[in-house]
A protein has these predicted regions:
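Structural motif
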Residues: 26-30, 68, 171, 210
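Short, solvent-exposed loop/turn segments at secondary-structure junctions
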Residues: 33-36, 74-76, 176-179, 215-216
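Metal-dependent active-site segment of extracytoplasmic phospho-/sulfohydrolases and closely related
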Residues: 48-90, 172
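Active-site neighborhoods of enzymes that stabilize oxyanions during catalysis
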Residues: 108-238
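His/Asp/Glu-rich, glycine-adjacent segments
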Residues: 1-40, 122, 136, 142-146, ...
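Short, solvent-exposed loop/turn segments at secondary-structure boundaries
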Residues: 39-44, 80-82, 221-223
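Acidic/histidine-rich catalytic neighborhood
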Residues: 58, 75-125
Length: 238
């Protein structure tokens, strides 16, 4: 069941059985982020999930595994204490100012699991029909409440390491209290039973990197670590 912790637990349980039956040099396990979307740190649901994860990691360690884990992103709440949501419907905003079909807002979180996040994230990219209006559109978006960063394609390639051939003319992120969607009519909020928690902005970039053995300090020469550095750290550092 994808809308529970069961799928993640199945992954760990399967790993235990595989390790018991055959010699494995390297195993990669990937869990879902449903619990993180639904529960903040310290909530019972979150605590129960991490208790389960900790139990399986302990079993893997006892079986002789060296364990390394990280996250693909952080997660922040986008809901006020009164239950109202902090949302920016970016396509509606730019259509209102510049006219329909002048800008095409592309949301990066559009998977079918809307119970997780309602297809809201903290990052969108925008393609413009008239490239001469890029600065004008950027200046307008910067004034929208909840927006944190507005940069052009060139800046996003340099600053965020975005692929130049697959990113729009403008990149927008919201601050850690807001989420961005496309058009209000495109999002079904009835599927969200708990406060909205999602990711994609600069406020969701802090993540843990854990390795079950001590490694030497030479890794510090890498500078600020990214989650993908975990492969290098786990395999190449003693």
């Amino acid at each position: 069941e994808v809308y529970s912790s069961d799928l993640s637990e199945f992954i760990f349980a399967a790993a235990i059985e595989i390790i018991k039956k055959e010699k494995i040099d390297l195993m990669y396990l990937s869990t879902t982020d449903f619990i993180q979307h639904k529960a903040a740190p310290g909530d019972k649901m979150a605590n129960d999930f991490y208790h389960m994860v900790d139990g399986y990691l302990s079993k893997l360690y006892d079986l002789g595994c060296e364990i390394s884990f990280t996250a693909d992103h952080g997660m922040k709440g986008k809901t006020n204490k009164d239950g109202s949501l902090n949302l920016i419907y970016m396509q509606d905003e730019v259509d209102k100012k510049f006219g329909k079909d002048e800008c095409n807002v592309v949301c990066t979180i559009t998977d079918p699991y809307v119970v997780h996040h309602g297809s809201f994230g903290s990052f969108v990219t925008i393609y413009l029909k008239d490239k001469s209006k890029i600065n004008e559109v950027m200046d307008y978006i910067k004034k929208i409440d909840g927006v944190e960063m507005v940069i052009n394609k060139e800046e996003s390639v340099k600053k965020l390491k975005q692929p130049e051939d697959r990113i729009g003319d403008i990149v927008v992120t919201s601050n850690e209290k807001f989420a961005i969607g496309k058009k209000e009519s495109d999002h079904d909020l009835t599927k969200l039973k708990e406060p909205l928690r999602t990711h994609g902005g600069l406020g969701e970039t802090d993540i843990p990197i854990f390795i079950s053995r001590k490694i030497d300090d030479s890794y510090k020469s890498k500078g600020i670590l990214k989650n993908y550095d975990i492969f290098d750290l786990a395999l190449n550092y003693g």
